[in-house]
């Protein structure tokens, strides 16, 4: 019985870095003269890849678009990445770790980066709310289960 439990879970954050960054204010400077009542859209995406045995890169892409009516006030995109050493887990647990736990670790860094970029663009402060990556991952699993077998034919 003890031989089955020899594989101990190991999770270690090796590095956090900004992989890509972009800030655009296509309608500046006249956008600064308008009443600031923006519609803010937040898009999130994650990707992961295995770099070596038990070593993974996870990239969290955060895109924020602020619009005033039909005009884009600013578009900000950050790809915050991390290198993680993960062992002792497999299957759904590994997918959850790469798709929820790691992005949870990266989001505060991406949020800070976006806040700084928006501020340097001289726009009013933008405070992004925390994101529940566990809930997003569960929704993703439910969508995959609902779509089920028909999508496997496309592969």
From Swiss-Prot:
Subcellular localization: Cytoplasm
Pfam families: SecB
Key word Ribonucleoprotein present: no
Recorded GO MF terms: unfolded protein binding
Gene Ontology BP annotations: protein folding; protein tetramerization; protein transport
Chloroplast among keywords: no
Main localization of the protein described in the UniProt heading: cytoplasm
Domain of life, source organism: Bacteria
InterPro entries recorded: SecB, SecB-like_sf
Disulfide bridge map: none
Family recorded in the similarity comment: Belongs to the SecB family.
NCBIfam families with a match to the protein in the record: PRK05751.1-1 (NF004390), PRK05751.1-4 (NF004393), secB (TIGR00809)
Subunit (UniProt): Homotetramer, a dimer of dimers. One homotetramer interacts with 1 SecA dimer.
Protein name: Protein-export protein SecB
Organism the protein comes from: Cronobacter sakazakii (strain ATCC BAA-894)
Gene designation: secB
């Amino acid at each position: 019985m003890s031989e089955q439990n020899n594989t101990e879970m190991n999770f270690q954050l090796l590095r956090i870095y900004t992989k890509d960054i972009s800030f655009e204010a296509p309608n500046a400077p006249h956008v600064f003269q308008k009443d600031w009542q923006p519609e803010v859209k937040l898009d999130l995406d994650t990707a992961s890849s295995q770099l070596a045995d038990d070593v993974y890169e996870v990239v969290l892409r955060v895109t924020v678009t602020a619009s005033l009516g039909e005009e884009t006030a600013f578009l900000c995109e950050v790809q915050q990445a991390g290198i993680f050493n993960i062992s002792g887990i497999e299957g759904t647990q590994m997918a959850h770790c790469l798709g929820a736990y790691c992005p949870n670790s990266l989001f505060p860094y991406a949020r800070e980066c976006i806040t700084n970029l928006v501020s340097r663009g001289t726009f009013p402060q933008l405070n992004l709310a925390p994101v529940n990556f566990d809930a997003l991952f569960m929704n993703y699993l439910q969508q995959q289960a609902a779509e089920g077998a028909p999508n496997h034919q496309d592969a």
